[in-house]
């Protein structure tokens, strides 16, 4: 029970990481229209996400449309889709394993060792989820920044960083922290059990010639 707060904090952060991963995957604000040069259209904003693009007109009307073809999408978008879907699945599995490893739920019996390993596994999966979220978000941001400063790209085709990218970075940080706490609990639990049950000292067996031999005591009777 000494490390119970680490379990709670790690699982709570993991839950928020799962919610953030789902939000980052579904939100269309990965790429937003840039207002530079002659492209100053303040009454229309364009959002581009993994699954749809949206056009907001006059800050009131919002029209969204899913991408019609999967094969016609850019390879970067297809890779980002795949990585984010894997991230959602990993976060969900990690959360389920972490809940089963909690001390209050007797899913694993009374073995503290099994529970610690389950929470450690959950932490590793949360960290992997953070990596899977960080890769497509940072990759997309790098492409946006590169095209923004590329003079050969038309001003109407340039985009800026959307809110979903910032949400993805924050989600990756939360997943790293939550996974680190759960892995830390697993390590601390192993050290605690190591000190609680010290290794018994090794005793060298005695040889046969070193055994104690009882010598009969001589009688003290005096002969007259």
Curated annotation (Swiss-Prot):
It catalyses: chloride(in) = chloride(out); hydrogencarbonate(in) = hydrogencarbonate(out); bromide(in) = bromide(out); iodide(out) = iodide(in). Pfam families: PMP22_Claudin (PF00822). Belongs to the claudin family. Keywords: Cell junction, Cell membrane, Chloride, Chloride channel, Ion channel, Ion transport, Membrane, Tight junction, Transmembrane, Transmembrane helix, Transport. One of its GO terms (cellular component) is bicellular tight junction. This is Claudin-17. InterPro entries: Claudin, Claudin_CS, PMP22/EMP/MP20/Claudin. The lineage of its organism: Eukaryota, Metazoa, Chordata, Craniata, Vertebrata. Gene3D superfamilies: 1.20.140.150. It is found in: Cell junction, Tight junction; Cell membrane. It is a multi-pass membrane protein. Does not form homotypic polymeric strands and it is not sufficient to form tight junctions by its own. Interacts with OCLN. Channel-forming tight junction protein with selectivity for anions, including chloride and hydrogencarbonate, and for solutes smaller than 9 Angstrom in diameter. In the kidney proximal tubule, may be involved in quantitative reabsorption of filtered anions. Does not affect water permeability.
